Regions:
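OB-fold/S1-family single-stranded nucleic acid-binding modules
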Residues: 98-118
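Exposed beta-sheet edge/beta-hairpin loop segments within beta-rich domains
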Residues: 72-88, 94-104
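A short secondary-structure junction signal
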Residues: 41-45, 102-103, 122
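Beta-strand elements of well-folded, non-transmembrane domains
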Residues: 34-36, 94-96, 114
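Hydrophobic residues positioned within well-ordered beta-strands of beta-sheet architectures
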Residues: 28-30, 90, 108
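OB-fold ssDNA-binding interfaces and closely related basic DNA-contact patches used
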Residues: 1-59
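Acidic, gly/ser/pro-rich intrinsically disordered tails
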Residues: 1-3, 116-133
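Extended, solvent-exposed segments with strong compositional bias
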Residues: 50-74
């Protein structure tokens, strides 16, 4: 079993409750936004990284609830999902390579580096400046 670590910011968190698709539970997951360096590391492993408005994103899935640790490595007692923009490291297991989706990424655990406030720092870095905002 090969493990890797990827650092980024939470875009979507489903670590306490299962994600839903068309009314069905589809498992636990976390979607990270990441910088180009982290995205390049994943791409080098044959992981498909999506681009959303100029920001690299990848979903890490699990069939089980995902352990969340604080920056000291201690288990966090959580009552709600991780907020958008939380800076984390995801330890993940390499799955099989799929011809369309690339290397499968299975979340093992998450280490919180800095709690988010709802914004993703990377989201506006690549945006063009406009006065119409």
């Amino acid at each position: 079993m090969s493990l890797s670590v990827t650092e980024g910011y939470i875009a979507f968190s489903h670590v306490l409750t299962e994600d839903q698709y068309q009314g069905q539970d589809v498992g636990y997951n976390v979607t990270l936004c990441m910088d180009t360096e982290e995205a390049a590391k994943l791409s080098a492993l044959d992981v498909i990284v999506k681009d959303y408005q100029g920001v690299a994103q990848r979903k890490f899935k699990s069939g089980y609830s995902i352990d969340v640790l604080d920056d000291n490595g201690q288990a966090m007692s959580m009552t709600e999902e991780l907020p958008r923009g939380t800076k984390v490291r995801v330890q993940w297991k390499h799955g099989n390579i799929h011809p369309q989706h690339g290397l499968a990424t299975y979340a093992n655990r998450i280490k919180v580096l800095e709690m988010g406030t709802g914004d993703i720092p990377l989201a506006f870095e690549n945006a063009e400046e406009t006065t119409d905002f």
